[in-house]
From Swiss-Prot:
The gene is Spata19. The keyword Chaperone does not apply. It comes from the Eukaryota. One of its GO terms (cellular component) is sperm flagellum. Keywords: Cell projection, Cilium, Developmental protein, Differentiation, Flagellum, Membrane, Mitochondrion, Mitochondrion outer membrane, Phosphoprotein, Spermatogenesis, Transit peptide. InterPro entries: SPATA19. Essential for sperm motility and male fertility. Plays an important role in sperm motility by regulating the organization and function of the mitochondria and is also required for correct sperm midpiece assembly. This is Spermatogenesis-associated protein 19, mitochondrial. PANTHER family: SPERMATOGENESIS-ASSOCIATED PROTEIN 19, MITOCHONDRIAL. The modification Phosphoserine is found at S26, S116. Its main location: mitochondrion. The keyword Phosphoprotein applies. It is found in: Mitochondrion outer membrane; Mitochondrion; Cell projection, Cilium, Flagellum.
């Protein structure tokens, strides 16, 4: 009975011109809400700190630009990791991706207008800040004996 019903169903679909099985996206989107919310909170906090820092610097250097909202130009900075770095700390890749995403999100944040002569200084300061944080993490991991052993193999 069940086999006959399935055969009739398949033949009916083919006679109408519909494919079997139906072309429906059967993938269920899975979202880890806790992980997403933690990452969003971390990124928002970092964005706010960067925005606050830039606003303070601008207000100190040029008070006449306050109140103007502009979109900061996008500047993608990718810091390449060596094989040795990847071998020593598997979480380094995740950290690097988060840092890159943070910088992209920061560069899209609406902030007070920066005079053109200050734009390069502000961008360079942010790039240096990201590099210092990555370098700080590397220094912390360099004191780890596992780091020394795996780097000597590189």
């Amino acid at each position: 009975m069940i086999i006959t019903t399935w055969i009739m169903y398949i033949l009916a679909r083919k006679s109408i011109g519909l494919p079997f099985p139906p072309r429906v996206n059967s993938d269920i989107e899975v979202e880890e809400t806790e992980a997403v919310s933690v990452v969003q909170h971390w990124l928002n906090k970092t964005e706010e700190e960067a925005s606050r820092s830039i606003k303070e610097k601008i207000s100190i250097n040029d008070p006449c630009t306050q109140g103007h909202d502009i979109h900061v130009t996008r500047d993608l900075v990718k810091h390449r990791l060596s094989k040795c770095d990847m071998l020593t700390d598997p979480n380094q890749e995740v950290l690097e991706e988060r840092t890159r995403i943070q910088f992209i999100r920061w560069s899209h944040t609406r902030i007070f207008q920066v005079p053109s002569e200050m734009m390069d200084d502000v961008i360079q300061e942010r790039i240096d800040q990201v590099r210092r944080s990555v370098s700080h993490l590397r220094c912390d991991s360099s004191s780890d004996p596992c780091y020394r052993n795996s780097c000597s193999e590189c």
